[in-house]
């Protein structure tokens, strides 16, 4: 259930990032439309077609990489994210995509590197700090992970997943009272799994 909730959240926010970064101004290309509708194979085809005429458009590589990721083609996804970053090294979309991908592949040090780079870019979303927190947690640096989750919450007070992840980490650290406060906040924000976790750990 936790993995489903996390993936659903990432899908939603990364769709938003794709549409925010549309390469053709107000016009959304075929790949973006197909990705938004969950048609990932068609999205790959759409992005590939656009790349024939716009081979240096980092947004198209990022979008195709996200589509490959949703199809479980992680090698192809990483290659496209790397192409996007070669064209635009400070693009936080591609950095977040790489961080998320490395978390999925359990390459936590690499995930931390990309998340940290994204976090340092002005205007980067709270997701960068969340991914940094997840990587730090997996590496075994819980206090640093708590700080990263806290930064994510400072950037976005309505970030249910940040409260939820911080609560789970606090449970692991036996700080149940603090964890329950975070579960409550995640519940108010209707984050999936928060109510069940509150019932499990706080009653």
Predicted region positions:
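Terminal, low-structured helical/coil segments at or just beyond the last alpha-helical repeat
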Residues: 172-203
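TPR alpha-solenoid repeat register
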Residues: 60, 94, 128, 162, ...
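Canonical tetratricopeptide repeat
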Residues: 63, 70, 97, 131, ...
């Amino acid at each position: 259930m936790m993995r489903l909730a996390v993936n659903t959240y990432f899908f939603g926010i990364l769709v938003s990032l794709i549409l925010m970064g549309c390469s053709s101004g107000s016009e959304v290309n075929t790949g973006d439309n197909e990705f938004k509708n969950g048609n990932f194979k068609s999205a790959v085809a759409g992005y590939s077609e656009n790349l024939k005429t716009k081979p240096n458009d980092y947004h198209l590589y990022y979008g195709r990489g996200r589509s490959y990721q949703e199809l479980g083609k992680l090698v192809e996804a990483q290659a496209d994210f790397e192409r996007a970053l070669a064209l635009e090294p400070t693009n936080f979309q591609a950095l977040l995509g790489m961080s998320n991908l490395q978390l999925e592949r359990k390459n936590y040090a690499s995930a931390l590197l990309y998340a940290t780079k994204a976090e340092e870019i002005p205007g980067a979303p709270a997701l960068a700090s969340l991914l940094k927190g997840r990587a730090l947690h997996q590496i075994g640096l819980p206090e640093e992970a708590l700080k990263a989750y806290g930064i994510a919450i400072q950037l976005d007070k309505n970030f249910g997943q940040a409260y939820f992840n911080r609560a789970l980490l606090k449970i692991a650290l036996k700080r149940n009272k603090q964890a329950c406060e975070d579960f409550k906040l995640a519940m108010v924000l209707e984050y999936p799994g928060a109510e069940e976790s509150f019932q499990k750990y706080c009653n």
